[in-house]
Amino acid sequence: MIKSELVQRIAEHNPHLYQRDVENIVNAILDEIVAALARGDRVELRGFGAFSVKHRPARAGRNPRTGAHVPVDQKSVPFFKTGKEMRERLNRDNPEGAAADDADD
């Protein structure tokens, strides 16, 4: 599901809201999550999961084409850890662990 599909779904489930308002709300939430991570904060949504930033140290990499060693700078990467309720629901709804079918979208 992409962001526009998420906005459309939320708007369909909330007919009292205009789709453009739902889009503004979704964008505001995502912007605030990104801003918090950029400040170094952790964002926890109980039952859903937690967003945080992991710092990867500089390391020596290798160009796969030439085999030459190249330095890879340190970097910060986003990290998401699922919440307990989400894990339980995913395992309850899908006990075999197989990918969900897109037919129900």
From Swiss-Prot:
SMART domains: BHL (SM00411). The keyword Transcription regulation applies. GO terms for biological process: DNA recombination; regulation of DNA-templated transcription; regulation of translation. The keyword Nuclease does not apply. SUPFAM superfamilies: IHF-like DNA-binding proteins. This protein is one of the two subunits of integration host factor, a specific DNA-binding protein that functions in genetic recombination as well as in transcriptional and translational control. This is Integration host factor subunit beta. The gene is ihfB.
